A protein has these predicted regions:
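Membrane-embedded alpha-helical bundles that constitute the cytochrome b-like, heme-associated redox core
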Residues: 1-154
Length: 154
C-alpha cells in the first residue's frame, strides 16, 4: 500500500503560511446557515402545514409547542425564530459579499477581512433590530388577528 504522502517531495509553500481569518469563518457560516435554513426552516414549515391541514386540534398542539397563552413565542419559539432570522441575515449578507467578490472587488486582504467582519456584525445587528421591532415596536402594538383555524385552548 502506498504512503499518504511522499516525505521526499516538498510541501506546497502556501500550505505552510496560511492563518485563520474572518473570511474563512464567513465562508463556513454561509454553508452552515444555508443548510440550517433548508433543514430547520423547511422542517418547521412542513410541521406547520401538516398541523394546519390536520385540523384545529393538531394546529393547537403546534401553537402550544411554540407559543404561550398570549400568543407570544415561548423559549422554543424564540430560539427557532431568532436562530432562523440570524441564519437568514448571515446568509444574505454573505451572499451580498460574494456578489461584490464576483464583480472583482474586495480581494485586497485588509478589505476582504473588513468586509467579512462587517458581514457578521451587520447580520447580528439586523437580527436584533428585527426582533426588537417585533417585540417592542409597532408590531407588538398591532391588534391580534385570529388564527387561520379557530382554536380553543383548554
Amino acid at each position: 500500500m502506498a504512503k499518504a504522502r511522499n516525505i521526499n517531495r516538498p510541501l506546497s509553500p502556501h500550505l505552510q503560511v496560511w492563518k485563520w481569518g474572518p473570511h474563512m469563518l464567513v465562508s463556513i457560516l454561509h454553508r452552515v446557515t444555508g443548510s440550517g435554513m433548508a433543514t430547520v426552516g423547511v422542517g418547521v414549515f412542513l410541521w406547520w402545514l401538516g398541523a394546519l391541514a390536520s385540523g384545529p386540534e393538531s394546529y393547537a398542539k403546534f401553537l402550544d409547542c411554540l407559543t404561550v397563552e398570549s400568543g407570544a413565542p415561548n423559549i422554543i419559539g424564540y430560539v427557532l425564530g431568532i436562530g432562523l432570522t440570524l441564519s437568514f441575515f448571515q446568509h444574505m449578507m454573505t451572499g451580498i459579499r460574494h456578489f461584490f467578490l464576483d464583480a472583482g472587488a474586495g480581494y485586497e486582504l485588509k478589505g476582504n477581512k473588513t468586509f467579512a467582519v462587517l458581514t457578521m456584525v451587520v447580520s447580528v445587528a439586523l437580527t436584533a433590530a428585527l426582533w426588537g421591532w417585533m417585540i417592542y415596536g409597532e408590531l407588538a402594538k398591532a391588534p391580534k388577528t385570529e388564527t387561520p383555524i379557530a382554536v380553543e385552548k383548554k
